A protein has these predicted regions:
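Pyridoxal 5′-phosphate
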Residues: 1-309
Length: 309
């Protein structure tokens, strides 16, 4: 047994895939439960960070339901116990730059395509001394002195660098909160939420306080709570030029209930009914009105079909 790795029950599918590989390599993988809003249960902190935990990996901003984890608080507790801490900041970086020196994080990863950069390129930030620690410890699995295999793509790296250079706003991180700038994205997201919250065919999910400023997530159903599958509404909206997702984008074609919706204990009948909308900086008031109307009409159309069955 090489030790224990802690991840949350709402991680991105890509991290769960790696966790399963590490499990086969002899690591013990333990999942940190979340509450109904998708936030980790801090009452379990001492249990999760007890021996033999060696690494904790927590998604900072959850892509499917938008909830934000208190990463600085967790990082501080990991530091006290000499536990390595990694966070997935893929959903955070598009919303603004942050001060790496003030984060209680040893390792941070992100991806370019979320901030209008090229697909196929990511970054891994390491606290000073961490790379040597990983390379010199065979149990972590790095070989030949390399963090990743293959030849780096210079055009993709340059594209990612340019995308970061174009970020002009800042995210403030306290021990318990991640504070985002108020801008057009947050205003348009709030405007769309204000319009959609009136719709009796939608139930909002995820933390409504600690959440990504560009993310809206809900369960779809008829007014009498008959489930409408997320895949159905995604297909209908895409035909009208509105591109949304059910579940995480990379697994939206998967059959069966969403692991994230299962983790937050949503109604079993609605665990395939998730819908996620992400707002970009180019969205206008007119776009919001159009999207709201089309979503309303599409849900009504699907509800009528359900009633005929």
């Amino acid at each position: 047994d090489k030790g224990r790795i802690i991840i949350t029950s709402v991680e991105h599918p890509s991290l769960n895939l790696i966790a399963n590989q590490l499990l086969n390599d002899g690591w013990d993988i333990k999942y940190w439960p979340v509450d109904r809003h998708g936030i980790i249960d801090l009452d379990l902190l001492d249990e999760m960070l007890s021996s033999p935990t060696k690494l904790v990996s927590i998604i900072w901003g959850q892509s499917e339901i938008g909830s934000i984890q208190p990463i600085n608080l967790i990082g501080m507790e990991c530091k006290k116990r000499n536990i390595l801490f990694h966070t997935d900041a893929t959903q955070i970086l598009p919303n603004g730059l942050f001060d790496w020196s003030n984060l209680n994080v040893d390792m941070l990863s992100a991806s370019a395509h979320k901030l209008q950069g090229p697909k196929g390129i990511g970054l891994l930030m390491l606290r000073k001394g961490i790379q040597d620690l990983l390379m010199n410890n065979p149990s972590y699995g790095f070989k030949n002195g390399a963090i990743r295999s293959g030849t780096e793509s210079v055009p993709l790296i340059a594209g990612f660098s340019t995308a970061i250079d174009l970020l002009s706003e800042y995210v403030e991180v306290t021990d318990n909160q991640t504070l985002f700038p108020e801008n057009n994205v947050s205003k348009m997201t709030s405007l769309l939420k204000k319009s959609l919250v009136k719709n009796k065919q939608l139930t909002f999910i995820g933390s409504q306080k600690e959440r990504l400023p560009n993310n809206l997530s809900f369960l779809c159903h008829t007014e009498s709570m008959i489930p409408i599958k997320g895949r159905e509404i995604v297909r209908l909206l895409s035909k009208q030029g509105i591109y949304t997702s059910s579940g995480s984008a990379c697994s939206s074609s998967s059959q069966g209930p969403s692991p994230t919706l299962v983790a937050i204990n949503s109604d079993k009948s609605l665990q395939e009914s998730g819908l996620r909308i992400t707002i970009g900086p180019w969205i206008s008031n007119n776009d919001i009105n159009t999207v709201s109307n089309i979503i309303f009409e599409s849900l009504q159309s699907l509800a009528l079909k359900k009633q005929r069955i």
